[in-house]
Swiss-Prot record:
It comes from Leuconostoc mesenteroides subsp. mesenteroides (strain ATCC 8293 / DSM 20343 / BCRC 11652 / CCM 1803 / JCM 6124 / NCDO 523 / NBRC 100496 / NCIMB 8023 / NCTC 12954 / NRRL B-1118 / 37Y). Belongs to the TRAFAC class YlqF/YawG GTPase family. RsgA subfamily. This is Small ribosomal subunit biogenesis GTPase RsgA. Its EC number is 3.6.1.-. GO terms for biological process: ribosomal small subunit biogenesis. CDD domains: S1_YloQ_GTPase, YjeQ_EngC. Binds 1 zinc ion per subunit. Monomer. Associates with 30S ribosomal subunit, binds 16S rRNA.
Amino acid sequence: MKTGRIIRSLSGYYDIQLPSGDIQRTRARGEFRKSKQKPLVGDFVDFESENDEGFIWAIHERENFLVRPPIANIDIAVIVTAAKEPDFAPNLLDRQLVALEAANVRPLIYFSKMDLLEKSEHEKINHVANYYQSIGYDVIFSDSKSAFEALKMMLKDHVSVFMGQTGAGKSTLLNHLSPQLGLETGEVSKALSRGKHTTRQVTLIEVDEALIADTPGFSSYEVFDFPVEELDDYFPEFVEKRQDCRFRGCLHLNEPGCAIKEAVAVGTITQSRYNSYKAFYELIKAQKPKYKTDN
Protein backbone atom coordinates (compact mmCIF):
# COMPACT_ATOMS: atom_id res chain seq x y z
CA MET A 1 0.00 0.00 0.00
CA LYS A 2 1.29 3.46 -0.94
CA THR A 3 0.39 6.89 0.40
CA GLY A 4 0.34 10.17 -1.49
CA ARG A 5 -1.55 13.39 -2.21
CA ILE A 6 -4.06 13.83 -5.02
CA ILE A 7 -2.84 16.68 -7.22
CA ARG A 8 -5.32 16.38 -10.09
CA SER A 9 -8.82 15.06 -10.67
CA LEU A 10 -10.07 14.63 -14.22
CA SER A 11 -12.86 12.48 -15.66
CA GLY A 12 -12.82 9.93 -12.85
CA TYR A 13 -9.03 9.61 -12.71
CA TYR A 14 -6.84 10.87 -9.86
CA ASP A 15 -3.17 11.73 -10.21
CA ILE A 16 -1.39 11.06 -6.91
CA GLN A 17 1.99 12.52 -6.03
CA LEU A 18 4.23 10.33 -3.88
CA PRO A 19 6.74 11.73 -1.34
CA SER A 20 9.45 10.96 -3.92
CA GLY A 21 7.76 13.31 -6.39
CA ASP A 22 6.64 10.52 -8.70
CA ILE A 23 3.05 10.67 -9.95
CA GLN A 24 0.71 7.68 -10.22
CA ARG A 25 -2.65 7.73 -12.03
CA THR A 26 -5.44 5.95 -10.15
CA ARG A 27 -9.18 5.50 -9.91
CA ALA A 28 -11.42 5.34 -6.85
CA ARG A 29 -12.80 1.97 -5.80
CA GLY A 30 -16.54 1.43 -6.18
CA GLU A 31 -17.02 1.53 -2.41
CA PHE A 32 -16.50 5.30 -2.50
CA ARG A 33 -19.44 5.77 -4.85
CA LYS A 34 -21.63 3.59 -2.65
CA SER A 35 -20.72 5.61 0.46
CA LYS A 36 -21.13 8.89 -1.47
CA GLN A 37 -17.60 9.85 -0.46
CA LYS A 38 -15.52 11.31 -3.26
CA PRO A 39 -11.75 11.82 -3.25
CA LEU A 40 -10.77 15.46 -3.66
CA VAL A 41 -7.69 17.21 -4.97
CA GLY A 42 -5.52 17.80 -1.91
CA ASP A 43 -6.58 14.57 -0.18
CA PHE A 44 -3.96 12.26 1.29
CA VAL A 45 -4.89 8.74 0.26
CA ASP A 46 -3.77 5.13 0.53
CA PHE A 47 -3.66 3.31 -2.81
CA GLU A 48 -2.30 0.26 -4.58
CA SER A 49 -0.93 0.16 -8.10
CA GLU A 50 0.15 -2.50 -10.56
CA ASN A 51 1.05 -2.24 -14.24
CA ASP A 52 0.38 1.51 -14.34
CA GLU A 53 -3.11 1.01 -12.90
CA GLY A 54 -3.95 2.11 -9.39
CA PHE A 55 -6.93 2.14 -7.08
CA ILE A 56 -7.56 4.36 -4.06
CA TRP A 57 -8.43 2.37 -0.94
CA ALA A 58 -8.69 4.99 1.81
CA ILE A 59 -8.90 8.76 2.27
CA HIS A 60 -7.08 10.24 5.26
CA GLU A 61 -8.94 12.57 7.61
CA ARG A 62 -9.14 16.09 6.18
CA GLU A 63 -7.98 19.27 7.91
CA ASN A 64 -10.58 21.18 5.88
CA PHE A 65 -12.25 21.18 2.49
CA LEU A 66 -14.14 23.43 0.11
CA VAL A 67 -17.07 22.52 -2.14
CA ARG A 68 -16.67 25.20 -4.82
CA PRO A 69 -14.08 24.28 -5.96
CA PRO A 70 -13.75 20.73 -4.62
CA ILE A 71 -10.38 20.72 -2.84
CA ALA A 72 -9.12 19.53 0.55
CA ASN A 73 -6.37 20.30 3.07
CA ILE A 74 -5.80 23.93 2.08
CA ASP A 75 -3.34 25.97 4.12
CA ILE A 76 -3.97 29.40 2.61
CA ALA A 77 -6.64 30.91 0.36
CA VAL A 78 -5.45 33.97 -1.55
CA ILE A 79 -8.42 36.25 -2.23
CA VAL A 80 -7.50 38.34 -5.27
CA THR A 81 -9.57 41.49 -4.82
CA ALA A 82 -9.71 44.18 -7.48
CA ALA A 83 -9.20 47.71 -6.21
CA LYS A 84 -10.66 48.95 -9.51
CA GLU A 85 -12.08 47.61 -12.79
CA PRO A 86 -14.22 46.07 -11.41
CA ASP A 87 -14.64 48.41 -8.45
CA PHE A 88 -13.85 47.13 -4.97
CA ALA A 89 -16.81 45.17 -3.60
CA PRO A 90 -16.67 44.88 0.22
CA ASN A 91 -19.71 42.62 0.38
CA LEU A 92 -18.09 40.07 -1.94
CA LEU A 93 -14.81 40.14 -0.02
CA ASP A 94 -16.66 39.67 3.27
CA ARG A 95 -18.64 36.80 1.79
CA GLN A 96 -15.43 35.07 0.77
CA LEU A 97 -13.86 35.70 4.18
CA VAL A 98 -16.88 34.30 6.02
CA ALA A 99 -16.93 31.19 3.83
CA LEU A 100 -13.23 30.60 4.48
CA GLU A 101 -13.60 31.19 8.22
CA ALA A 102 -16.44 28.65 8.28
CA ALA A 103 -14.27 26.15 6.39
CA ASN A 104 -11.30 26.71 8.72
CA VAL A 105 -9.09 27.99 5.90
CA ARG A 106 -6.64 30.86 6.48
CA PRO A 107 -7.40 33.83 4.15
CA LEU A 108 -4.87 36.19 2.61
CA ILE A 109 -6.22 39.33 0.91
CA TYR A 110 -4.38 40.47 -2.22
CA PHE A 111 -5.47 43.85 -3.60
CA SER A 112 -4.86 43.86 -7.37
CA LYS A 113 -4.85 46.70 -9.92
CA MET A 114 -3.60 49.22 -7.37
CA ASP A 115 -1.75 51.01 -10.18
CA LEU A 116 -5.11 52.11 -11.65
CA LEU A 117 -6.09 54.15 -8.59
CA GLU A 118 -6.06 57.91 -8.22
CA LYS A 119 -4.47 59.26 -5.03
CA SER A 120 -7.80 59.66 -3.22
CA GLU A 121 -8.86 56.14 -4.25
CA HIS A 122 -5.53 54.79 -3.07
CA GLU A 123 -6.04 56.35 0.35
CA LYS A 124 -9.50 54.81 0.57
CA ILE A 125 -8.22 51.31 -0.21
CA ASN A 126 -5.39 51.79 2.29
CA HIS A 127 -7.96 52.66 4.94
CA VAL A 128 -9.98 49.56 4.08
CA ALA A 129 -6.87 47.36 4.15
CA ASN A 130 -5.78 48.75 7.51
CA TYR A 131 -9.11 47.72 9.00
CA TYR A 132 -8.87 44.16 7.70
CA GLN A 133 -5.32 43.94 9.04
CA SER A 134 -6.52 45.21 12.42
CA ILE A 135 -8.94 42.28 12.73
CA GLY A 136 -6.27 39.73 11.93
CA TYR A 137 -6.12 39.29 8.16
CA ASP A 138 -2.93 39.37 6.09
CA VAL A 139 -3.05 41.94 3.28
CA ILE A 140 -0.73 42.44 0.30
CA PHE A 141 -0.89 45.23 -2.32
CA SER A 142 -0.08 44.60 -5.98
CA ASP A 143 1.84 47.87 -6.32
CA SER A 144 4.28 47.05 -3.54
CA LYS A 145 7.79 46.38 -4.86
CA SER A 146 8.12 43.46 -2.49
CA ALA A 147 4.57 42.13 -3.04
CA PHE A 148 5.48 39.06 -5.08
CA GLU A 149 8.39 38.11 -2.85
CA ALA A 150 6.23 38.53 0.25
CA LEU A 151 3.53 36.38 -1.32
CA LYS A 152 6.01 33.68 -2.32
CA MET A 153 7.38 33.56 1.22
CA MET A 154 3.88 33.18 2.68
CA LEU A 155 3.04 30.39 0.23
CA LYS A 156 6.29 28.47 0.74
CA ASP A 157 5.76 24.90 1.99
CA HIS A 158 1.98 25.39 1.90
CA VAL A 159 -0.97 24.33 -0.24
CA SER A 160 -2.80 27.41 -1.45
CA VAL A 161 -5.88 28.11 -3.49
CA PHE A 162 -6.49 31.31 -5.46
CA MET A 163 -9.94 32.83 -5.57
CA GLY A 164 -11.51 36.17 -6.26
CA GLN A 165 -13.96 38.32 -8.10
CA THR A 166 -14.13 37.50 -11.78
CA GLY A 167 -11.88 39.85 -13.70
CA ALA A 168 -9.85 40.74 -10.61
CA GLY A 169 -6.63 39.42 -12.13
CA LYS A 170 -6.26 36.00 -10.52
CA SER A 171 -4.67 34.35 -13.57
CA THR A 172 -2.47 37.40 -14.13
CA LEU A 173 -1.14 37.10 -10.58
CA LEU A 174 -0.53 33.37 -10.99
CA ASN A 175 1.36 34.00 -14.22
CA HIS A 176 3.58 36.50 -12.39
CA LEU A 177 4.27 33.97 -9.66
CA SER A 178 5.05 31.25 -12.19
CA PRO A 179 5.30 32.28 -15.87
CA GLN A 180 5.46 28.63 -16.97
CA LEU A 181 1.81 28.20 -15.98
CA GLY A 182 0.78 30.17 -19.07
CA LEU A 183 -2.76 30.63 -17.80
CA GLU A 184 -5.19 32.39 -20.11
CA THR A 185 -6.32 35.73 -18.76
CA GLY A 186 -9.92 36.63 -19.46
CA GLU A 187 -10.80 40.10 -20.63
CA VAL A 188 -13.36 41.95 -18.58
CA SER A 189 -16.70 42.56 -20.24
CA LYS A 190 -17.40 46.28 -20.05
CA ALA A 191 -21.11 45.68 -20.42
CA LEU A 192 -21.33 43.34 -17.45
CA SER A 193 -18.16 44.36 -15.56
CA ARG A 194 -17.46 40.67 -15.17
CA GLY A 195 -14.68 38.48 -16.50
CA LYS A 196 -14.87 35.48 -18.74
CA HIS A 197 -14.35 32.14 -16.99
CA THR A 198 -11.13 30.75 -18.44
CA THR A 199 -10.04 28.06 -15.94
CA ARG A 200 -11.22 24.52 -16.62
CA GLN A 201 -9.95 22.01 -14.05
CA VAL A 202 -8.69 21.62 -10.48
CA THR A 203 -4.95 20.94 -10.32
CA LEU A 204 -2.23 21.40 -7.71
CA ILE A 205 0.88 22.79 -9.39
CA GLU A 206 4.37 22.98 -7.90
CA VAL A 207 5.64 26.56 -7.91
CA ASP A 208 9.04 26.97 -6.28
CA GLU A 209 8.48 25.36 -2.87
CA ALA A 210 4.69 25.69 -2.84
CA LEU A 211 1.68 23.82 -4.18
CA ILE A 212 -0.78 26.18 -5.84
CA ALA A 213 -4.28 25.43 -7.10
CA ASP A 214 -5.96 27.53 -9.76
CA THR A 215 -9.58 26.51 -9.82
CA PRO A 216 -12.91 27.19 -11.55
CA GLY A 217 -16.13 28.21 -9.84
CA PHE A 218 -14.76 30.66 -7.29
CA SER A 219 -16.49 33.85 -8.44
CA SER A 220 -19.19 33.86 -5.78
CA TYR A 221 -20.75 32.06 -2.83
CA GLU A 222 -24.42 31.31 -3.31
CA VAL A 223 -25.09 29.76 0.09
CA PHE A 224 -23.66 29.51 3.58
CA ASP A 225 -23.86 25.97 4.92
CA PHE A 226 -24.17 26.73 8.64
CA PRO A 227 -26.90 27.91 11.05
CA VAL A 228 -27.58 31.63 11.21
CA GLU A 229 -26.72 31.57 14.93
CA GLU A 230 -23.11 30.80 14.00
CA LEU A 231 -22.70 33.75 11.62
CA ASP A 232 -20.99 36.04 14.13
CA ASP A 233 -18.40 33.30 14.80
CA TYR A 234 -16.94 34.13 11.39
CA PHE A 235 -16.55 37.88 11.96
CA PRO A 236 -13.38 38.08 14.13
CA GLU A 237 -14.16 41.56 15.45
CA PHE A 238 -17.63 40.42 16.50
CA VAL A 239 -16.23 37.49 18.49
CA GLU A 240 -14.14 39.88 20.55
CA LYS A 241 -16.98 42.25 21.42
CA ARG A 242 -20.10 40.07 21.57
CA GLN A 243 -19.34 39.02 25.15
CA ASP A 244 -20.34 42.56 26.14
CA CYS A 245 -23.82 42.26 24.63
CA ARG A 246 -26.59 42.50 27.23
CA PHE A 247 -28.27 39.31 26.10
CA ARG A 248 -26.62 35.95 25.58
CA GLY A 249 -27.28 34.77 22.02
CA CYS A 250 -27.68 38.34 20.77
CA LEU A 251 -28.05 38.38 16.99
CA HIS A 252 -26.89 42.02 16.77
CA LEU A 253 -29.97 43.21 14.93
CA ASN A 254 -32.75 44.74 17.03
CA GLU A 255 -31.72 43.70 20.55
CA PRO A 256 -31.11 46.45 23.13
CA GLY A 257 -27.68 46.67 24.71
CA CYS A 258 -25.92 45.16 21.69
CA ALA A 259 -22.17 45.74 21.93
CA ILE A 260 -21.73 45.15 18.20
CA LYS A 261 -24.16 47.91 17.22
CA GLU A 262 -22.52 50.22 19.75
CA ALA A 263 -19.11 49.48 18.20
CA VAL A 264 -20.51 50.30 14.75
CA ALA A 265 -21.93 53.58 16.07
CA VAL A 266 -18.52 54.71 17.35
CA GLY A 267 -16.63 53.38 14.32
CA THR A 268 -14.74 50.54 16.00
CA ILE A 269 -16.49 48.17 13.61
CA THR A 270 -16.98 49.53 10.10
CA GLN A 271 -20.45 50.10 8.71
CA SER A 272 -19.63 48.02 5.63
CA ARG A 273 -18.75 44.99 7.75
CA TYR A 274 -21.97 45.34 9.72
CA ASN A 275 -23.93 45.75 6.48
CA SER A 276 -22.37 42.52 5.24
CA TYR A 277 -23.34 40.76 8.47
CA LYS A 278 -26.97 41.86 8.11
CA ALA A 279 -27.06 40.90 4.43
CA PHE A 280 -25.63 37.45 5.17
CA TYR A 281 -28.09 37.00 8.04
CA GLU A 282 -31.00 37.60 5.67
CA LEU A 283 -29.40 35.36 3.05
CA ILE A 284 -29.07 32.44 5.46
CA LYS A 285 -32.60 32.93 6.81
CA ALA A 286 -33.96 32.82 3.26
CA GLN A 287 -32.06 29.67 2.28
CA LYS A 288 -33.92 26.42 1.94
CA PRO A 289 -32.79 23.68 4.36
CA LYS A 290 -29.83 21.78 2.98
CA TYR A 291 -29.15 18.19 3.88
CA LYS A 292 -25.45 17.44 4.16
CA THR A 293 -23.79 14.56 2.36
CA ASP A 294 -20.28 13.25 2.80
CA ASN A 295 -17.60 14.63 0.53
